[in-house]
Amino acid sequence: MANTFLLKIITPGREVYNDQVEKVTLKSADGEFQVLANHQSLISTTIPCIAKFKDAKGNDEELFISKSLVQINNNEMVISSDAAEFEEDIDEERAERAFRRAEDRLKNSENYNRGRAEAAFFRAKQRLALKKSNR
């Protein structure tokens, strides 16, 4: 267990994950980063992405996370995210509708807030990528 650390993933509505892991890979605006046990203290943000981690039993796991705040301290990592969903929790039809709606809003951006449409498009795209990658 010396090469593991505690990962907590929380959203406003629930605790999504709380267990020991070997490593976590996330994406920030500056690129991908990986966290291992005994990482230095850090506060960072992420962009919507497919977060990857290896649990203490060696199983590879993936989940969608929306924009997040990440805090690492004393071998504990807390990801506070607007949304976090494992593949089985993603409603594919809803994600498809959100993707099409955002795509339409980007095409007609003079009628919509382009930044919000881009964010919605990217979130839906990441959810669908995770859902379809595990088929």
UniProtKB/Swiss-Prot annotation:
Keywords: ATP synthesis, Cell membrane, CF(1), Hydrogen ion transport, Ion transport, Membrane, Transport
Classification via Pfam families: ATP-synt_DE, ATP-synt_DE_N
Annotated signal peptide: none
Keyword Transferase: no
Cellular compartments annotated: Cell membrane
GO molecular function, one term: ATP binding
Disulfide bond entries: none
Keyword Amino-acid biosynthesis: no
Gene3D superfamilies: ATP synthase delta/epsilon subunit, C-terminal domain (1.20.5.440), F0F1 ATP synthase delta/epsilon subunit, N-terminal (2.60.15.10)
One cellular component term from this protein's GO annotations in UniProt: plasma membrane
Membrane topology: Peripheral membrane protein
Subunit text: F-type ATPases have 2 components, CF(1) - the catalytic core - and CF(0) - the membrane proton channel. CF(1) has five subunits: alpha(3), beta(3), gamma(1), delta(1), epsilon(1). CF(0) has three main subunits: a, b and c.
Function per UniProt: Produces ATP from ADP in the presence of a proton gradient across the membrane.
Family: Belongs to the ATPase epsilon chain family.
Cited NCBIfam families: ATP_synt_epsi
Name of this chain's protein: ATP synthase epsilon chain
Organism whose genome encodes this protein: Clostridium beijerinckii (strain ATCC 51743 / NCIMB 8052) (Clostridium acetobutylicum)
